[in-house]
């Protein structure tokens, strides 16, 4: 069957997500929407360099074009002051954008053009309104910092905003950021309008301009609380203070749960807040309390003069009981359709009462390790943010009710003190209590839960598709696999494995010839979450970031967008997108907050479920990550997140639980670090007890790439696959070669370190996942095809496969036939026998003048090795060299040519004796 991916609809849907995710914090002096008949002045170099996403694996999507905000304004008919624009263009050319030093080394911001006050005054004579754009980035292995140019405004930005404010009648500030930033100087300078336009992917400028010009009224809501200072956040005292450990002393009181309970005065903008060009009247028309649910009918009327959408948010105030609760907790939300002035819509929201229960990790209610609906009054509030939501209804719970009876799992092994509310004359103060520690023997628990071994039969000719078609059982299929086969199937191969789509993150499943012989296909994973990362240079669609998607509060639009994403994946033979990222915004300095949704687990889970449902419509899926408590990038491979079991279950695991139970998640990635002393890659409680036994997860799990694994009390080891597999974490990502690897699986099988039945269970999980993939359909010869229409010719990719070259210690590639025309790329891949630091020598010539600057940039696995800038050589061959680490067997390279006039001769790779 052929399916259609309409690229124009894809672009339009992404731009719509941008416009619905933008959050307008203020709009004084009727600064917005813009009058397109009047000229505007645009300040800030980010007008040319829109941040489509943050950095690292979540942002490395190759695109043909990013629509920046300036493009969007001009395309929407806005008149932009040409003199100011030309001045910026000239300065930007003389002061190139700083790409930084590659992976984890990109600057958080760029230097700004110093403003001549005379120019500002001159442009202000013809322009009533100025737009100032400030940009930020951060990402993988790069947290934000509490310093100028990162979380704080830089001196240049303060000076720019100040002089513009002094000279313009109306000032609009756009924050092109992946994460909230400090608002102190912004509040002091007081622009008329302030909008978080986030990072909107390749269509970000279009969606932003649609809002600025009034084509779309802003309807985004804050997925995080904006406090006055970074130190106001409850996690601040325990974020990054220790090299290898963060203690989650704030417990369940994360974000608005803390502020609304203990510190309302520290909030600048509350969770869920966001303005529109119009106004809405919200009334709870009906509240029905049943045994299992609270059903609310809420009328929303547009009483303003612009069309627009509104988000209805429902919060619950539970009785404090013996456990202690947050003052308000989000328990439902819906977004209206677009309402014209005076139009009204009734929104129906149902709240599952059982999901209002709190987890008792201490036994204080008499129900240890249970979710308990404590006795007392449960009040519900309805509105458009957590602070302004008004009382709607309540019900009385007569006695404690256990809604779910579980067992202690993943509890800390060391006690610490956590926050607990103390009620004093109608207000709460912060008390403390000791956190319960684990009483579980993890090794004994694992042995108690060993599956039954399947007797080995050898090859009976059963193929995996025979299981799919009901001809044989999965047990009969798994019985054929030898010990060696079982050791291979738990290896992911990559990055850039030739078994799957070029430039992707990994192959899994059929990673050996023997496994292929059983009809096990090689499934394909690609980073993720903001679109496909294809390191061979293939162009893909860059999506709005997770924070922007959460800000839309629009589940239906999210599913629609990710159906397009799924079709694009299918067209590129990708089975798993490594996303959505689901970690909680515990602190605003976390560098990967842009990938994640929110400080709230309910919103996180609902939006992730919407993404998964969308991808499922195309026969593909996402890998929910990072499981769990991955809330800091600094020293992420060794960090220990020390968290109470209650906080884990109610905050840091809850979003994952919703994604599994409501979104049908079938692929999960663990973290690099530890939770309560044990690396998550080998944590049995996490991967088996909670994920599979409690939540009913049916699918496969994987480690993060080159993750550490350990046994309680022992040092981490990247080769301890036995510890990973017996935890029921199924695949180690990644190995250079699926058929041979320096791991301990077979040795552990011989000495009793792992049981054969456990490896069979891993194999069944992996094969069970592959049963439902396009990869298996292709192996059967019945795969669907996806036809892409309305994609411009220059965006189409060459179908020629990437060529692999085997390398022992050195190789020289003749590149004299490569097209070096400006804007083109050339990709190739190396199959390495030896890993280490390689010297890269590029030889080229040019007949241009000696002053000519002809740059070409070399990328390794999507990360810049460096730019080789040649001058005119009089036609003589000249060599330039750099060094790059290569520690993956399959390494994909891409050369990008930024200027005409270079005659490329060769590229040589030589292994050096340098250590990493």
Per-region residue spans from a language model:
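Glycoside hydrolase catalytic-domain context in secreted enzymes
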Residues: 1-388, 408-850, 854-916
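Short beta-strand elements
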Residues: 388-407
């Amino acid at each position: 069957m052929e399916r259609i991916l309409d690229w124009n609809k894809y672009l339009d849907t992404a731009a719509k997500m941008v416009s619905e995710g933008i959050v307008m914090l203020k709009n004084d002096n009727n600064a917005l929407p813009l009058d397109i008949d009047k000229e505007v002045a645009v300040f800030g170099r980010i007008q040319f360099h829109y941040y489509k996403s943050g950095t690292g694996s979540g942002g490395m999507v190759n695109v043909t074009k990013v629509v920046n905000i300036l493009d969007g304004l001009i395309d929407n008919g806005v008149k932009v002051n040409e003199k100011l624009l030309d001045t910026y263009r000239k300065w930007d050319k003389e002061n190139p954008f700083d790409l930084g030093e590659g992976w984890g080394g990109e600057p958080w911001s760029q230097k700004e053009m110093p403003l001549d006050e005379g120019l500002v005054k001159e442009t202000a004579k013809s322009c009533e309104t100025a737009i100032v754009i400030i940009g930020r980035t951060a990402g993988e292995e790069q947290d934000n910092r509490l310093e100028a140019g990162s979380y704080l405004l830089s001196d240049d930005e303060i000076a720019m905003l100040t002089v513009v404010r002094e000279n313009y009648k109306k000032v609009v500030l756009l924050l092109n950021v992946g994460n909230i930033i400090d608002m102190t100087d912004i509040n002091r300078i007081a622009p008329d309008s302030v909008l978080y336009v986030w990072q909107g992917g390749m269509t970000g400028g279009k969606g932003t301009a649609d809002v600025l010009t009034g084509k779309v009224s802003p309807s985004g809501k804050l997925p995080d609380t904006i406090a006055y200072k970074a130190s106001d956040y409850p996690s601040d005292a325990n974020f990054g203070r220790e090299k290898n450990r963060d203690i989650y002393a704030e417990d369940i009181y994360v974000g608005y749960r803390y502020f609304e309970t203990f510190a309302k005065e520290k909030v600048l903008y509350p969770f869920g807040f966001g303005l529109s060009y119009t106004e809405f009247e919200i009334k709870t028309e009906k509240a029905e309390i049943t045994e299992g649910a609270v059903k609310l009918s809420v009328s929303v009327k547009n009483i303003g003069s612009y069309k627009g959408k509104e988000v209805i948010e429902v919060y619950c105030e539970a009785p404090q009981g013996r456990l202690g609760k947050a003052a308000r907790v989000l328990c439902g939300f819906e977004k209206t359709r677009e309402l014209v002035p005076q139009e009204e819509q009734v929104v129906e929201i149902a709240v599952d009462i059982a999901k209002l229960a709190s987890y008792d990790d201490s036994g204080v209610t008499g129900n240890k390790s249970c979710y308990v609906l404590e006795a007392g009054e449960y009040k519900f509030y309805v509105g458009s943010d957590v602070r302004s939501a008004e009382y709607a209804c309540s019900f009385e719970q007569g006695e404690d009710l256990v809604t779910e009876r579980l067992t202690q799992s993943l509890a800390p092994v060391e006690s610490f003190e956590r926050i607990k509310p103390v009620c004093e004359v109608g207000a709460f103060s912060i008390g403390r209590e000791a956190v319960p520690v684990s009483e579980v023997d993890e090794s004994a628990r694992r042995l108690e839960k060993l599956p039954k071994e399947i007797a080995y039969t050898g090859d009976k000719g059963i193929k995996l598709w025979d299981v799919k078609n009901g001809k044989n059982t999965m047990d009969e299929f798994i019985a054929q696999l030898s010990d060696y086969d079982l050791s291979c199937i738990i290896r992911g191969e990559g990055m850039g494995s030739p078994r799957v789509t070029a430039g992707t993150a990994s192959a899994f499943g059929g990673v050996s010839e023997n496994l292929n012989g059983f009809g096990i296909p090689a499934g394909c994973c690609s980073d993720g979450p903001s679109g496909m990362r294809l390191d061979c240079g293939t162009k893909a669609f860059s999506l709005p970031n997770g924070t922007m998607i959460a800000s839309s509060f629009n589940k239906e639009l999210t599913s629609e967008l990710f159906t397009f994403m799924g079709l694009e994946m299918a067209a590129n033979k990708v089975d798993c997108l490594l996303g959505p990222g689901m970690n909680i915004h515990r602190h605003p300095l976390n560098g990967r907050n842009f990938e994640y949704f929110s400080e709230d687990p309910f919103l996180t889970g609902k939006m992730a479920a919407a993404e998964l449902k969308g991808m499922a419509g195309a026969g593909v899926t996402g890998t929910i990550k990072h499981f769990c408590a991955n809330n800091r990038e600094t020293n992420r491979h060794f960090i220990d997140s020390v968290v109470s079991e209650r906080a884990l279950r109610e905050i840091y695991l809850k979003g994952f639980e919703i994604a599994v139970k409501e979104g049908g998640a079938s692929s999960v990635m663990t973290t690099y670090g530890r939770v309560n002393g044990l690396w998550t890659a080998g944590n049995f409680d996490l991967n088996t007890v909670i994920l599979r036994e409690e939540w009913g997860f049916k699918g496969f799990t994987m480690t993060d790439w080159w993750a550490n694994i350990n046994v309680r009390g022992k040092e981490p080891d990247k080769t301890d696959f036995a510890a990973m597999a017996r935890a029921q974490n199924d695949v180690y990502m990644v190995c250079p070669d699926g058929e041979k690897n320096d791991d301990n699986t077979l040795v552990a099988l011989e000495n009793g370190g792992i049981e054969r039945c456990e490896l069979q269970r891993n194999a069944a999980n992996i094969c069970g996942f592959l049963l439902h993939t396009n990869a298996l359909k292709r192996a059967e010869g019945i795969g669907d095809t996806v036809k892409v229409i309305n994609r411009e010719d220059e965006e189409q990719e060459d179908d020629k496969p990437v060529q692999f070259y085997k390398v022992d210690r050195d190789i020289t590639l003749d590149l004299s036939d490569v097209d070096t025309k400006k804007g083109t790329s050339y990709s190739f891949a190396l199959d390495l026998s030896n890993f280490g630091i390689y010297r890269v020598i590029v030889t080229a010539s040019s007949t241009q003048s000696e002053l000519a600057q002809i740059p070409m940039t070399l990328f390794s696995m999507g990360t810049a090795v460096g730019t080789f800038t040649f001058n005119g050589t009089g036609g003589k061959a000249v060599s330039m060299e750099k060094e790059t680490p290569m520690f993956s067997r399959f390494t994909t390279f891409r050369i990008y040519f930024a200027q005409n006039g270079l005659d490329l001769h060769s590229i040589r790779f030589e292994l050096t004796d340098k250590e990493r």
